[in-house]
Amino acid sequence: MSPSEQQVNELVRQIVEAVHPLRIILFGSAARGEAGPESDIDVMVVMPEGTNHIETLGFLHTQLHGLGFGVDIVVVTPQELARYGDDIGFVYHDALREGKELYAAAA
C-alpha cells in the first residue's frame, strides 16, 4: 500500500526522534508523484560527518519496523553529498535533483 502524507510525516518524525539528522530528503517515485499501491518510500537521511552509516541504517530499520509500508533509506553526510552529488552514477544525484526536502535541522 502506498503511504499517505500523514504516514510520511510520521516516518519523518520517527527518523528525527531516533537519529537527529541534518536533513531528510524524499526521492524516487513518491517525490515525483508517481508512487503506486506497491511503491516504497525512498528517503535520504543526511547525518553529521563521522556518522557510522551501517550502525545508523541498522538502528533506523529497527526503529521503523512495522510502519505498514516499505522504506528504503540512504544514509549520507554533507561531505559525501558535496563530493558525489553531481555524479550521475550515484543515487545522491537523483535524490538531490528530484528530491523534496521533508526536514532540515535548525542551524
PLM feature spans:
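Structural signature of the urease/amidohydrolase superfamily beta/alpha-barrel
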Residues: 40-42
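Glycine-rich beta-strand-to-loop/alpha-helix junction loops that act as flexible
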Residues: 27-29
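Catalytic core of pol beta-like nucleotidyltransferases
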Residues: 1-23, 32-37, 48-107
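Short hydrophobic/aromatic beta-strand micro-patches
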Residues: 44-46
